[in-house]
Amino acid sequence: MILKLNGYGYSSNSYLIIGKKNILIDPGTSGTFNILMEELERNGIKDIDLIINTHCHFDHTSADYLIEEYFNCPTIIEDKEVKHLKNGDEVTVSSLFGAKLNPPKEIIPLSEIEEELKSYGLEIIRTPGHTYGSISIIYENSLITGDTIFAYGVGRWDLPTGDVIQLRNSINLLERIANERNIDKLYPGHGEIGDRMAFSYAKLFI
């Protein structure tokens, strides 16, 4: 199952995949860490095995190190964005939030663990456009889309490594996959859960 943990303020939504492993997608900001922990406790979650970041932006990743410290679990991110997460550089857009990104200690490039993730039921789709290392995740006939597409809009493409053509192509790819596999639930990086109507809304923006 996928447990939605609402984002607060400018923090991203977080999602917990509960299956063979407890996998936390996008822990959000360090400023909302305590709220996230309260939600996990309220849902009876005592262990996190892995963190996956859909991309390296501060509002999705700055609580990585706190989750790592508490649960002793590594963070996974697409290979191209490992260096940005480690360095907390301009690609993480931490300066937009007036803060510094403290990276987790153990970061695993996606390519090194992708086959293992398949054994847990996760299929990774590379969806560049919002950033060049953005990913989406298929799990149990649902799509976790990060900031590629929202229920009623699309992610920005004007930030470092963003590209509107890549974003359009990625959204078209996700739409094709959703139609072919009859996936009708989208879990975006911000806002409410969507369905395949999200792809129609996306066309209004790109």
Swiss-Prot record:
SUPFAM superfamilies: Metallo-hydrolase/oxidoreductase (SSF56281). Zn(2+) 1 binds at residues 55, 57, 130, 147. Transmembrane segments: none annotated. It comes from the Archaea. Its cofactor is Zn(2+). InterPro entries: MBL_Glyoxalase_II (IPR051453), Metallo-B-lactamas (IPR001279), RibonucZ/Hydroxyglut_hydro (IPR036866). Its EC number is 3.-.-.-. Binds 2 Zn(2+) ions per subunit. Keywords: Hydrolase, Metal-binding, Zinc. Zn(2+) 2 binds at residues 59-60, 147, 190. GO terms for molecular function: hydrolase activity; metal ion binding. Belongs to the metallo-beta-lactamase superfamily. PANTHER family: HYDROXYACYLGLUTATHIONE HYDROLASE GLOC (PTHR46233:SF3). This is Probable metallo-hydrolase MJ0888. It comes from Methanocaldococcus jannaschii (strain ATCC 43067 / DSM 2661 / JAL-1 / JCM 10045 / NBRC 100440).
